Regions:
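Active-site mouth loops of central-metabolism enzymes
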Residues: 13-25, 73-89, 115
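Short, acidic/polar
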Residues: 21-34, 83-100, 142-150, 239
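N-terminal binding-site loop/beta-alpha segment at the start of enzyme catalytic domains
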Residues: 1-68
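Active-site groove signature of glycoside hydrolases
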Residues: 96-117
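Acidic (Asp/Glu)-rich catalytic clusters
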Residues: 2-5, 36, 58-68, 96-102, ...
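Conserved, mostly hydrophobic/aromatic
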Residues: 10, 34, 42, 57, ...
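Beta/alpha (TIM)-barrel catalytic core signal, keyed to glycine-rich beta->alpha loops juxtaposed to Asp/Glu
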Residues: 112-261
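A short, structured active-site edge motif that brings together acidic residues
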Residues: 66-79, 107
Length: 262
């Protein structure tokens, strides 16, 4: 339904090559297909494919005003993590160049943990970008498993975090009505897709090959089987339905790698 459609943001990490290689023409085809289907909001980051994903979005959509692009700062291609204002500025300028635009929708801090000691100067920098019309909203993308209780998340317009049937910590976040919550990883890196088994082995260039294996994979699959047993719907449908119906969630990032995922 259109009410649900407006909740959907297309995630581009899985297209970028970090989940196994994808070629350029295929990426362009998938992005245009999303656009044709009325999906106009995309989530990306400079580190996805080392700038490659932003470059692809720029070459497909350029400055199109009916496309919303959300990106991140704090983790740059080849350079790694830094939340020093000068580095954030540089990173954001490179993002605009790659995207071929003068404005983006939401700019997120990319999974900061202990690196930021002074959020005030960061807010000042992001508020300036808002005033200059370079970004519409400022956000923070939360790192998995890190405790943000000492930070006032309500100073941000948008908070992004993992939210799925295997990651329910987002329920503990206390956000004001003015702060939107954006869910990511709805299928828990594929664990809720129905395509992973306890003996699955991932390609070497797929980031999951590092952490999703052995006992960890087996114990997660036990939890997945439990979820599967509670309904006769297909697993990914159970997972998506749960998020779409959760009123605490304002937007959901669905990652795609091919047209069939749309």
């Amino acid at each position: 339904s259109s009410e649900f459609k407006s909740k959907i943001v297309i995630g581009t990490w899985s297209l970028s090559g970090d989940y196994g290689s994808v070629d350029l023409s295929k990426i362009q085809e998938v992005l245009l297909y999303c656009y044709e289907k009325g999906l106009r909001e995309f989530d990306t980051a400079p580190s996805y494919g080392n700038g490659f994903m932003e470059f692809c979005l720029g070459s497909v959509f350029g400055n199109k005003s009916d496309v919303l692009i959300n990106s991140k700062i704090g983790n740059s291609p080849f350079y790694g993590k830094s939340f020093i204002i000068g580095d954030l500025k540089k990173s954001f300028e490179c993002t605009l160049k790659r995207l071929k635009r003068d404005n983006i929708n939401i700019l997120f801090l990319h999974n900061p943990r202990t690196e930021i000691h002074d959020y005030d100067s960061i807010h000042q920098f992001m508020d300036e970008l808002k005033r200059d019309g370079k970004i519409n909203f400022k956000g923070i993308s939360l790192a998995k498993g890190y405790d943000y209780s000492s930070i006032d998340l309500n100073r941000f317009d948008v908070v992004q975090d993992d939210a799925n049937l295997l990651s329910m910590d987002y329920k503990k976040l206390i956000l004001s009505e003015k702060t939107l919550f954006m869910a990511r990883s709805p299928l828990a890196s594929g664990l809720l897709s129905g395509n992973i088994a306890p003996n699955t082995v991932f390609e070497k260039n797929d980031h999951r090959s590092f952490w999703l294996k052995g006992d960890r994979l087996i114990s997660l699959m036990k939890r997945v089987d439990k979820i599967r047993g509670q309904s006769n719907l297909l697993l990914p449908i159970i997972a998506r339905k749960f998020l779409l119906e959760d009123t605490q969630i304002n937007r959901i990032i669905f990652g795609i790698k091919k047209k069939e995922h749309v």
